[in-house]
């Protein structure tokens, strides 16, 4: 993670500019969706499933 910007390097968006941002939705369990469809990160999905089983059916998201 050495290629991340410092907090000071990011520009804060106001509400007007935030409305222009186009992005997808991340569900916290390895699934994320955009306009073109959904995809699964199977490693993360499996890990989320194991955590859910270990926590008695309570997810960590």
UniProtKB/Swiss-Prot annotation:
GO terms for biological process: defense response to bacterium; killing of cells of another organism. Residues 1-24 form the signal peptide. It is found in: Secreted. One of its GO terms (cellular component) is extracellular region. InterPro entries: Bacteriocin_IIa, Bacteriocin_IIa_CS, Bacteriocin_IIa_dom_sf. Disulfide bonds join 33-38. Keywords: Antibiotic, Antimicrobial, Bacteriocin, Disulfide bond, Plasmid, Secreted, Signal. It comes from the Bacteria. Belongs to the bacteriocin class IIA/YGNGV family. Bacteriocin active against Listeria monocytogenes. This is Bacteriocin mesentericin Y105. It comes from Leuconostoc mesenteroides. The gene is mesY.
